[in-house]
């Protein structure tokens, strides 16, 4: 029997991950009510099935991959449906949120009886023939996400509570931005002093500075 996964919503990341899951044998559900024509076409191209909001609760796992500002509202909108469903899917919030907000979402969904997992996607949407982004998961029930590893996703489990995966993503992003900011400042300083050509040459030869 195929694993059934609901992905909300089919944006650039959600549809690309859906395509990877479908490629590896999963059945992927979504709800396209009120969505734009471009979103509908993207979802269909990824092999996603348009189902009623009520059917979403029948999935084995629900992956929330929405704009960060919509994540809390989505969780609240699903509470009644998930609470009343006899089938209890695993809910993985994969959005770029703070650890505090991830904990808030877990609290919102606690009454549903569903297992809640904190997820964090690091990397670009998966492309055909490429490994794709890393999906970090944390929380007491994070082991229940392991099936995603068999469906083509690069799943990384963190031994930490809800919020740990979110903290990893925030820290990683902060380090990258800090490195780039320092690098840009140094390149500008070199340029002002007439050393930019030599600096670029040196950076090109020094593998440890290949980021720049």
Describe these PLM feature segments.
Residues 10, 32, 64, 94-95, ...:
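Glycine- and other small-residue-rich loops at beta-strand/loop junctions that grip anionic moieties
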Residues 51-100:
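Rossmann-like NAD(P)-binding element
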Residues 28, 50, 115-116, 155, ...:
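Hydrophobic beta-strand scaffold residues
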Residues 5, 97-177:
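Rossmann-fold dinucleotide-binding core
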Residues 168-212:
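Helical "substrate-binding/catalytic lid" subdomain
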Residues 1-58:
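NAD(P)+-binding Rossmann beta1-loop-alpha1 motif at the extreme N-terminus of oxidoreductases
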């Amino acid at each position: 029997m195929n694993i059934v996964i609901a992905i909300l919503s089919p944006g650039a990341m959600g549809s690309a991950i859906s395509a990877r899951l479908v490629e590896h044998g999963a059945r992927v559900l979504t709800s396209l009510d009120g969505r734009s024509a471009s979103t509908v076409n993207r979802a269909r191209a990824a092999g996603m099935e348009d189902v009623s909001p009520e059917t979403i609760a029948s999935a084995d796992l629900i992956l929330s991959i929405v704009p960060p500002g919509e994540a809390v509202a989505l969780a609240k909108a699903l509470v009644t449906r998930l609470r009343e469903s006899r089938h209890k899917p695993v809910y993985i919030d994969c959005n770029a949120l703070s650890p505090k907000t991830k904990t808030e979402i877990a609290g919102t969904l606690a009454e549903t009886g569903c297992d809640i997992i904190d997820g964090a996607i690091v990397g670009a949407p998966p492309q055909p023939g490429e490994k794709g982004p890393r999906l970090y998961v944390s929380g007491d029930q994070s082991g229940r996400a392991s099936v995603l590893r068999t469906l083509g996703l690069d799943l990384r489990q963190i031994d930490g509570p809800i919020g740990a995966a979110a903290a990893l993503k925030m820290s990683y992003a902060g380090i990258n931005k800090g490195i780039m900011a320092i690098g840009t400042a140094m390149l500008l300083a070199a340029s002002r002093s007439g050393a930019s050509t030599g600096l670029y040459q040196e950076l090109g030869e020094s593998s440890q500075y290949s980021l720049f």
